[in-house]
Amino acid sequence: MSNTQNPNIHCSFCGKSQDDVKKLIAGSDVYICNECIELSTRILEEELREEQDSEMLEVKTPKEMFDHLNEYVIGQEKAKRALAVAVYNHYKRINFAASKIAEDIELQKSNILLIGPTGSGKTFLAQTLAKSLNVPFAIADATSLTEAGYVGEDVENILLKLLQASDFNIERAERGIIYIDEIDKIAKKSENVSITRDVSGEGVQQALLKIIEGTVASVPPQGGRKHPNQEMIQIDTKNILFIVGGAFDGIEEIVKQRLGEKIIGFGANNKKLNDDDSYMQEIIAEDIQKFGLIPEFIGRLPIVAALERLTEEDLIQILTEPKNALIKQYKQLLLFDNVELEFEDEALMAIARKAIERKTGARGLRSIIEEVMMDIMFEVPSHEEITKVIINEAVVDGKAEPQMIREAKKK
């Protein structure tokens, strides 16, 4: 209320008297003027805006994410596009919720299923995207998970890995990305696919359902099984993006059966090799369910992207072109010893062929190069006269020694 009886009354905050302001509001032995009220209101509004801005994530456009992936990932154009759009929409959804615009509309989370052979780049795609967005990222192996009551990891331990990746910053963790690999290995037993282990089958799918769709989970900070008296960390998973991946070996046969195309007779193997990738692009939810994932679990993974088997040409590009290309890395390692490293084209082709023969894809390239480079990297630092090392096809195949160019004295 305004007080005009006592001329000594003044604002308790700015010290102005009642004659210098329009209004003085009285409290219990405290007074505040209209100017201080207006100032405090502005301060509060600014703080609220700043808090809201801090909740908003800076999201790259799908094109920007796609271009970033192209710097590191060779091939898989369709999968990269699908992943870029899905991740963009996911973080746009989080910003939409933080902005409190159209609160009567609820945008649901769209988790992602990546299907592709071993070494096709599923894990690397997810990892590269998370790094470009500067959000916490964790990788889990579905085969290590078991349902409650069995020996193994609780599904909540996946969230612990994300917390660790965010230095236990819960707010950052709640906007992170989790990649669960080998998801096809927890398919339930079915007449179409032989799965020997059911302990981590349908039961684990059921356990994963809640954290994938969004729940407040209790996470043991030290990991392991939960104990009644153990202090827990509460983490809300509604804004965590889950990307799950698996090879789904044999699912192309399920697709063929659905499409009514059975490959039999002479030349079947050649046709199979040529057509498997195209069949993988035709996968629908029905095929995944027939493989062994339960409908409820599939429903939480509305975006499905199939990765193609990497060709010899793809693997050579992976070896030489990306920013983190293995050949560039090994060249730099020898350059530290002032030695030039050269891989002949035939050597690169031989490395790619080995990876295909071993069915390891891009994942196996490093181990093959390590086999080739081990003795070289052991010997070179002790021989200052060596200035260049040349590796050809015979060296990769273990049939010859690398050519080493020497000078009388190394400068």
UniProtKB/Swiss-Prot annotation:
Limits of the ClpX-type ZB domain: 1-52
Cellular-component GO terms for this entry: HslUV protease complex
A GO molecular function held by the record: zinc ion binding
InterPro entries, per the entry: AAA+_ATPase, ATP-dep_Clp_protease_ClpX, ATPase_AAA_core, Clp_ATPase_C, Clp_protease_ATP-bd_su_ClpX, ClpX_bact, P-loop_NTPase, Znf_CppX_C4
Keyword Cytoplasm part of the UniProt annotation: no
GO biological process, one term: cell division
Keywords of the record: ATP-binding, Chaperone, Metal-binding, Nucleotide-binding, Zinc
Residues annotated as binding Zn(2+): C11, C14, C33, C36
Residues that, per the record, bind ATP: P117, T118, G119, S120, G121, K122, T123, F124
Pfam family, one: ClpB_D2-small
SMART domains, alphabetized: AAA, ClpB_D2-small, zf-C4_ClpX
HAMAP family, per the entry: ClpX
Role summary: ATP-dependent specificity component of the Clp protease. It directs the protease to specific substrates. Can perform chaperone functions in the absence of ClpP.
Assembly and interaction partners: Component of the ClpX-ClpP complex. Forms a hexameric ring that, in the presence of ATP, binds to fourteen ClpP subunits assembled into a disk-like structure with a central cavity, resembling the structure of eukaryotic proteasomes.
Family per similarity comment: Belongs to the ClpX chaperone family.
NCBIfam families, sorted: clpX, PRK05342.1
Protein name per UniProt: ATP-dependent Clp protease ATP-binding subunit ClpX
Native organism: Lactococcus lactis subsp. lactis (strain IL1403)
Lineage of origin: Bacteria, Bacillati, Bacillota, Bacilli, Lactobacillales
Gene that this polypeptide is encoded by: clpX
